[in-house]
Amino acid sequence: MRLGRLGAAGVVAVVVVPLGASAAGAQTPITPEQCAAFVAAKQISGGAVRDCLQLAAIDASDLTITGDVDLRALGTVDHPIRCQRCHLEGGLRIADVTFTRAIDFDGVLIDGSIDARGATFQAPVLARAEPSTPSGVTGTADFSLATFADAVTFDDLSFGQSANFDGARFESSVSFQGAQFGADAQFERVAVEGFFVLSGGTVQQETSMRDGVFHGTVDLESRNFRGGLNAAGADFTGRTNLSLATFGASGGPDGLVLDGASFADVDASGATFASHASVRLVHATALNLNQASALAGLDLQGTQVDGPASFDGAELQGALDLQKFAASQIVLDIGALGNVASGPARRSILSKIERTARDAGDIQLANDARFRLLQVDGSNSAFPKREVDWVFYEQLGGYLVRPLRPLRALFVLILIGTAARYVVDWHRERTGQLAVVGNGVGAMGRRVRVGHEITGFLGRFSRALIASLRPKPNITSPVGETTVEPYVIAGLRLFEYVASKLLIVVFFLCLGNYNATLRDVLGSVKL
């Protein structure tokens, strides 16, 4: 009678205890038919998921999974998993588990955290968001030291808290295109054999790619790194695309840190560095910062670029540190150099621009760099050398690279000569040395007077022009004169002649430096 009661209690225990649970330590086996029934009912427990994966694949959609899914006891999962638009009402614990078949979690929503530390995925992993349903992980996602042997995609997925991929190995490609990160994103010491895509979307806190190794193309285009990006010491052997990305926030810490990193081609065209950007001791094959905006300073100290470094159209606010920066060719908006951190760095980069531009045949850029370089030298001089440099070398001579400067000075000299001839003629009229044309009467007289003034101006202007251009001075010697006036006039005319000839010579020298053909002709002349 006592054994009967115990037997009945055992039957009740089997009925009451859910599938996959144990009674008095005994494991109740689950059948494939029961797994199929759970899938058809669109609801299954986390424990049942574990038990079903020991028997067969899971192929479901719009499935609700209650509780945590803990697969650590399985060690290896040899069946594929397809669970599209599924909702896991708990965490996913798969640390150190090996998955030999593909995983399709498109549209999945995990209301908990993922612990995938040390997990191995030997087949593709798909976890893309779908616009029709909320998708992502509300808790933390820890894939540190995980290995992905095939392609992985987390496109448009939402990570509510920290996402950690430190030390992970991606033996193929990985994509986070459009993924949203509510906290930080950690990719320190990762190794990626294929392409790495992190374009679009926003990372609210710091993104770290320090000491990572990226063998393929890295695409960070249009990504908003609100907490900044730190890729110090990383190695990028493929092309790196930072175009249109935003790094940091106004008033925040460093928005971009690439110190000691190694790159192939770097394209940061149109990028915005909202806070300070540190790109020190970087080595790159080429650097493109065209149309980029550095709003809080850019530090390129010690960076070496084997090919061209282009800053064309860049907006550079704050300090621009280019000390020991080197590139085979530099394309930089000369006007942006007012923000260079130090005088020696400013002079060094201008010299580099002039030399590389002249070697490339870009005479205009070379002349602009030369002019600005001499401006910098002149402004750093002491009084009165600084003032003399500004008047004679910069404004009158154009530093021999701006032909309009001496031409403008020559025109002003001719106007001064015209005005001086007005004064001399007026003085001679007063002293009776020059005949005065009588004034007319009435309207006819006014018309005659206006015509006389125009004719007088043109006559004096032409005399000043001829005096400036004639090959010989044609100055009457004042020797023997008893008054001072002839000596003064002769001295002024001699000054006019000498100054005009000097300005003409300087103009042709500037023109020779300004025009590539004339420069070659002048350079071929041997004295």
Over which residues does each language-model region extend?
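Secretory targeting and sorting signals
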Residues: 1-26
